[in-house]
C-alpha cells in the first residue's frame, strides 16, 4: 500500500536546496496547551531541541533551554517579571533571548544571549516555529473555524494534557491517517464490519500540501458509539474523513445521519444526527518520540 503522505512530504523544503525527511522546521508545531504555561518555566523537547517556555505580561515566550554562561537548563530557574532567571548564577534573559542582567556587574558581556523562538497562541494551544524566523507567518496554520465557533463544543483531549508516545511522529501520523483500521481496532466504538465494502477516496492538493482520505457508507447499521449518541431507529449513512496538512496536522470529521437525509460534513446539527471533529497534532520530540 502506498502512503500518499510520503510523496508530498518529500517535496517540502526547509530551505532552498535542503530537504529534511525527518523534521520540517519551517512550520508551526503545537508546543503546549495554553493552560500548561503558568508562573513556572515549562521544559519541552521540540524537534530534538530543548526549549523552555514561560508566560509574560503580553503572552508566551520560548527560549533555548540552556544558559549561555554554564549551560544549565533555564527551565531550572524562575520567572522574574517578563524575564527568565537562570537557577545557577542568576543571569536574566528577556523574551528575545538577550541577557539583560548579570548579578554583580553592570556590563552585559557581548554574545550573552540564547536563541528565542517565534510563538503564538491559537485554538487553545501554544505554537512554536523552529525554522527561519522570517518565514513564520501565522496564516500557515490551517483555518479550523469550528474550534472558535460557539456552535461547536470543544472538549480538550486528556483533560488538556499532552500524550507522550515512544514512536516517530511519522508513524503516529500514519496511524491517524489510516481510516481502514477502524473496523478492527475500534470495533466496540466507531468500527463496523459493514464499512469495509465502501471504497476509500484519496485527494491531494499539491500547492496547499494537503491530503484527504475519506470513506462514505450508505444504509448500514450504526456503529456502537453513534447508536448510543444518536439513538437511530434504523440504518444510517455515515462518513469518515481525515485531512492531513503538513507537517503533521490531522483533522478528522466523522458522523452518522438517518438514511437519505444527506451526508453534509460540517452542517449536521443534533436534530439530524451525530457529528464530531477530532484534532490530532503530533509534535516531533526526537526521532523516536512524539
PLM regions and their residue ranges:
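Detector for Asparagine
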Residues: 14, 20, 26, 48, ...
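C-terminal catalytic domain of Rieske-type non-heme iron oxygenases
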Residues: 137-290
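Short Pro/Gly-enriched beta-strand edge/turn motifs at strand-loop
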Residues: 24-33, 96-104, 183-186, 260-265
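Short edge beta-strand segments in beta-sheet-rich domains
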Residues: 26, 114-116, 277
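Rieske [2Fe-2S] iron-sulfur-binding domain
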Residues: 4-13, 17-20, 30-152
